[in-house]
């Protein structure tokens, strides 16, 4: 941008690299990221609460919208991140976390999955979304478009089954 801050991807570094966020993609380094900001002075700022990455022994219950009555339970760490989008819409970002950073959580079984949980509040009770992570090398990755102020964390979503009723017309 015109301020000379053209940081298209960044990671935290203490005590070890944890979350890496890139504009559109994650490249070998900032200069190699081919994406550009649509508007000058657009940026994301994020930080974490320095919480532990081990399982909290508390579970986050997520209700799915649409009146299905379905829920899932997610084991989460105490570490959460706050991210602020400033200056307008940044667009889609790619988020990566080393799989080894999730080792304090329960190991996913064949029906479980690593997820990123996003919400409007630090208690993860308002406008809660989950995004499934996929494995890419030594990382778990997801694409997400952060808008405004959001909180996010990572976890292991447990398979939850239930019956659904379908009414066919005709």
Whereabouts are the PLM-identified features?
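Generic structural hydrophobic/aromatic packing signal, biased to beta-strands
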Residues: 44, 95-97, 116, 152-154
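A general structural signal for short secondary-structure junctions and capping/turn motifs
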Residues: 34-36, 105-108, 143-145
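C-terminal beta-strand-rich structural cap/linker in extracellular carbohydrate-active enzymes
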Residues: 138-162
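Short, solvent-exposed loop/edge segments of extracellular or virion-exposed proteins
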Residues: 165-170
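Solvent-exposed serine/threonine-rich low-complexity stretches and specific carbohydrate-binding patches
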Residues: 127-138
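Catalytic cores of secreted or luminal carbohydrate-active enzymes
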Residues: 1-71
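Proteolytic processing hotspots in large secreted/extracellular or virion-associated proteins
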Residues: 64-114, 120
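Acidic glycine-/aspartate-rich tracts in secreted/extracellular proteins
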Residues: 120-125, 158
């Amino acid at each position: 941008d015109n301020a000379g801050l053209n940081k298209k991807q960044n990671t935290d570094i203490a005590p070890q690299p944890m979350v890496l966020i890139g504009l559109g993609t994650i490249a070998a380094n900032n200069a190699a990221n081919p994406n550009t900001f649509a508007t000058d002075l657009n940026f994301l700022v994020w930080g974490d609460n320095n919480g532990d990455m081990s399982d909290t022994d508390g579970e986050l219950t997520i209700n799915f919208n649409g009146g299905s009555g379905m829920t899932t339970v997610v084991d989460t760490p105490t570490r959460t991140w706050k991210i602020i989008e400033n200056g307008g819409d940044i667009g889609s970002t790619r988020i990566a976390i080393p799989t080894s950073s999730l080792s304090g959580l329960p190991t996913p079984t064949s029906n479980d999955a690593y997820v990123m949980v996003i919400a409007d509040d630090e208690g993860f009770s308002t406008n809660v979304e989950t995004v499934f992570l996929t494995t890419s090398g030594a990382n778990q990755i997801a694409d997400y478009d952060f808008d405004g102020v959001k909180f996010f964390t990572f976890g292991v979503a447990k398979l939850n089954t239930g019956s659904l009723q379908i009414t066919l017309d005709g």
